[in-house]
Amino acid sequence: MGTRSHYLDLGFLLLLFLPAECLGAEGRLAHKLFRDLFANYTSALRPVADTDQTLNVTLEVTLSQIIDMDERNQVLTLYLWIRQEWTDAYLHWDPKAYGDLDAIRIPSRLVWRPDIVLYNKADTQPPASASTNVVVRHDGAVRWDAPAITRSSCRVDVSAFPFDAQRCGLTFGSWTHGGHQLDVRPRGTSASLADFVENVEWRVLGMPARRRVLTYGCCSEPYPDVTFTLLLRRRAAAYVCNLLLPCVFISLLAPLAFHLPADSGEKVSLGVTVLLALTVFQLILAESMPPAESVPLIGKYYMATMTMVTFSTALTILIMNLHYCGPNAHPVPAWARVLLLGHLAKGLCVRERGEPCGQSKPLESAPSLQPPPASPAGPCHEPRCLCHQEALLHHIASIASTFRSHRAAQRRHEDWKRLARVMDRFFLGIFFCMALVMSLIVLVQAL
């Protein structure tokens, strides 16, 4: 331990009494290299030995964060790290002549930089170059790493909202140099997602790169560019919980109006209340959706549900009118008696009180309302008691006829009420199946 402390003290004394010239040798060599490199250097011209030579630029993009996705204005804001690499023919040296100095870092404004810009930028601000350093190696290789906040146009397709996926392209290319002067190529087949910060609304599926060579109407020479396509899928959990599931529950509640007794007086009120609730959710959905030509999937579901509730409410009103048909109403038509009160009532297990399920009551013919035969005309020649019996029988027959008429009217009223119950049971099954199928179709899209 004492020997180690002795060597440390000796090293400290040597550093203390060394001349400053020895300590700054590397710094002096870097200054000398800088002066030698930039003595006759200009950043205004392409750094190529031959003007006919094409300068190759390699472009690499790292996605760091999705700042904003403005669906209404269709603008995507990203935070990127952009790396550009090229070879400068005038920035090379022999490392042995400069103390094995292999690379230097200098401000990027001092060297020539490719005028690569984002073609589909969505703001009016002029492109600004980041004031970061470039790394220059002894063989002339230049690497420029710069952060950038980009605002690019992105066509948003909301036809499958909230289960939609978007494709947003970022196209980079030279603004003034054609393909014969500057050729840009991507490094690798896709952008890097190693340092990506997860977004709460969007899930990134990838960011493949593709090189294109296009010819524009203004110029005859080709212009190469590199397009990075950002593949996004919306995280739909919040929309499912806040917009979709309430609509599903409400749509399943609407057919239950057919199960309410007609005498409760709440059948129509339930349908109107459900329709108002769907209207409120439709307004909330419209506020969160961008204006578009195509109707989103959830919007179609809302419209289909509102249409179903409207028809169910209208049918409920019709069924209530049938239920409250009075004794003076016409009899149930023969076809309705056979099809609805016969076969359909048996299939739906709608029966009268005391009638077992599955056995329909035989249809009775209307009772005969013929008056009793009149007594022969002329004076009564029978004994007095017989005349009183005939008068009593005549009054009893009249009372029986009135009772039979009242009973027939009551039976007509009961037939209409039974017909209303059959239609209630039938439309309950139909509309509940419709609501269930529509809800399953939408929910399957989330899987």
Curated annotation (Swiss-Prot):
Membrane topology qualifier: Multi-pass membrane protein
Keyword Magnesium attributed: no
GO biological process: chemical synaptic transmission; detection of mechanical stimulus involved in sensory perception of sound; inner ear morphogenesis; membrane depolarization; monoatomic ion transmembrane transport; negative regulation of ERK1 and ERK2 cascade; positive regulation of cytosolic calcium ion concentration; regulation of membrane potential
Parts of the chain on the Cytoplasmic side: 323-425
Record-annotated membrane-spanning stretches: 238-258, 268-288, 302-322, 426-446
Catalytic activity field: Ca(2+)(in) = Ca(2+)(out); Mg(2+)(in) = Mg(2+)(out); K(+)(in) = K(+)(out); Na(+)(in) = Na(+)(out)
Pfam families in UniProt: Neur_chan_LBD, Neur_chan_memb
UniProt keyword Oxidoreductase present: no
InterPro entries named among the record's database cross-references: Neur_chan_lig-bd, Neur_chan_lig-bd_sf, Neur_channel, Neuro-gated_channel_TM_sf, Neuro_actylchol_rec, Neurotrans-gated_channel_TM, Neurotransmitter_ion_chnl_CS, Nicotinic_acetylcholine_rcpt
Site (Involved in the interaction with the conotoxin GeXXA): 31
Tissue expression summary: Expressed in the outer hair cells of the cochlea and the neurons of dorsal root ganglia.
PROSITE patterns: NEUROTR_ION_CHANNEL
Signal peptide: 1-24
CDD domains per UniProt: LGIC_TM_cation
Assembly and binders: Forms homo- or heterooligomeric channels in conjunction with CHRNA10. The native outer hair cell receptor may be composed of CHRNA9:CHRNA10 heterooligomers. Found in the stoichiometric form (CHRNA9)2:(CHRNA10)3.
Further remark: The heterooligomeric receptor composed of CHRNA9 and CHRNA10 has an atypical pharmacological profile, binding several non-nicotinic ligands including strychnine (a glycine receptor antagonist) and atropine (a muscarinic acetylcholine receptor antagonist).
Role description: Component of neuronal acetylcholine receptors (nAChRs) that function as pentameric, ligand-gated cation channels with high calcium permeability among other activities. nAChRs are excitatory neurotrasnmitter receptors formed by a collection of nAChR subunits known to mediate synaptic transmission in the nervous system and the neuromuscular junction. Each nAchR subunit confers differential attributes to channel properties, including activation, deactivation and desensitization kinetics, pH sensitivity, cation permeability, and binding to allosteric modulators. Forms heteropentamers with CHRNA9.
Protein name: Neuronal acetylcholine receptor subunit alpha-10
Record gene name: Chrna10
